[in-house]
């Protein structure tokens, strides 16, 4: 069992929910990322998604697109993200999920990525644009090296896709709260409740909801329905706005703590 599996087992026993934090690795520079992860963990983040910057990020909204551009400009590659993970592992046991697109993974090589990611301390991988209908070789390569494979289900997902997502996912299933790209929203889509129900019927895995979550109120609303809530653009925006500030890590920790309070006293 990976750190991801152990995390959710522990949280289930303690009747608590997970706050999953996304950040773009290498933004504003690769050297910044380990310290930013430490700040997120101090603030209460239970699992970290390390986003791999990519030149054609079709699922990303403008905030994360800009973060990817900054990270690429700073020389961040898939290989350097794995090096960042190694540095994080020197001081932390927080579960790490590699969040990337299919193209960089195919260029790197499936088996090579599985081996190198496992050696770097990565616990799982999520390919945002992977076709679950054609995922067998990818899943086999990741599982061969002990990595979880997390897949996305959206309000528009067919029953067949949900069935395959349930079959190939390990660790947890990532539910997209709405269609479209990532980004903060004032309100959450009403379509997420039927999606939760549909995926619950297909798997016993923990469910995490992401896309558009940026406030403690969002965390509170969804935390009563699923095992985990994912926050991404709100963290990335804070990093963007305070990249030159000596207090960036303190601000990130404080905001994480504020979001975590959305789960209530048992978070």
UniProtKB/Swiss-Prot annotation:
Checking Pfam families in the record gives:
Trp_syntA (PF00290)
Cysteine disulfide links: none
**Catalytic site positions:** 49, 60
The EC category is: lyase
- Reaction(s) catalysed (UniProt annotation): (1S,2R)-1-C-(indol-3-yl)glycerol 3-phosphate + L-serine = D-glyceraldehyde 3-phosphate + L-tryptophan + H2O
EC number of this enzyme: 4.2.1.20
Pathway connected to this protein: Amino-acid biosynthesis; L-tryptophan biosynthesis; L-tryptophan from chorismate: step 5/5
Quote the cellular component terms of the Gene Ontology held in the record.
Answer: cytosol
Q: Which PROSITE patterns match?
A: TRP_SYNTHASE_ALPHA
Q: Which domain of life is it from?
A: Bacteria
Entry-linked Gene3D superfamilies: Aldolase class I (3.20.20.70)
Task: Identify the keywords attached in UniProt to this record, alphabetized.
Answer: Amino-acid biosynthesis, Aromatic amino acid biosynthesis, Lyase, Tryptophan biosynthesis
UniProt-recorded Gene Ontology molecular function terms: tryptophan synthase activity
How the protein assembles, per its UniProt entry? Tetramer of two alpha and two beta chains.
What PANTHER family does the annotation carry? TRYPTOPHAN SYNTHASE ALPHA CHAIN, CHLOROPLASTIC, TRYPTOPHAN SYNTHASE, ALPHA CHAIN
Task: Identify its protein family.
Answer: Belongs to the TrpA family.
- Stated role: The alpha subunit is responsible for the aldol cleavage of indoleglycerol phosphate to indole and glyceraldehyde 3-phosphate.
> Which protein, by its recorded name, is this?
Tryptophan synthase alpha chain
């Amino acid at each position: 069992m990976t750190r991801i599996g152990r995390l959710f087992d522990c949280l289930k026993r303690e009747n608590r929910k997970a706050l999953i934090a996304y950040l773009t690795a290498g933004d504003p520079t690769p050297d910044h990322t380990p310290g930013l992860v430490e700040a997120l963990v101090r603030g209460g983040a239970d699992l970290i998604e390390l986003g791999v910057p990519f030149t054609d990020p079709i699922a990303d909204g403008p905030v994360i697109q800009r973060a990817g551009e900054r990270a690429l400009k700073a020389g961040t590659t898939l290989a350097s993200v794995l090096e960042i993970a190694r540095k994080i592992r020197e001081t932390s046991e927080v579960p790490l999920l590699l969040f990337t697109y299919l193209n960089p993974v195919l260029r790197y090589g499936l088996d090579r990525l599985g081996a190198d990611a496992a050696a770097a301390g990565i616990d799982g991988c999520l390919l945002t644009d992977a076709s679950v209908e054609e995922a067998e070789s990818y899943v086999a390569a990741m599982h061969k090296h002990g990595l979880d494979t997390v897949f996305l289900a959206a309000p528009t997902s067919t029953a067949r896709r949900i069935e395959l997502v349930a079959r190939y996912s390990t660790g947890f299933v990532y539910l997209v709260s709405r269609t479209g790209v990532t980004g903060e929203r004032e309100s959450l889509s009403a379509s997420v409740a039927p999606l939760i129900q549909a995926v619950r019927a297909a798997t016993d895995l923990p469910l995490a909801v992401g896309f558009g979550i940026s406030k403690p109120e969002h965390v509170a609303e969804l935390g009563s329905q699923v095992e985990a809530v994912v926050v991404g653009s709100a963290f990335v925006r804070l990093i963007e706005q305070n990249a030159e500030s000596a207090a960036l890590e303190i601000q990130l920790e404080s905001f994480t703590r504020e979001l975590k309070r959305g789960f209530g006293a048992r978070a």
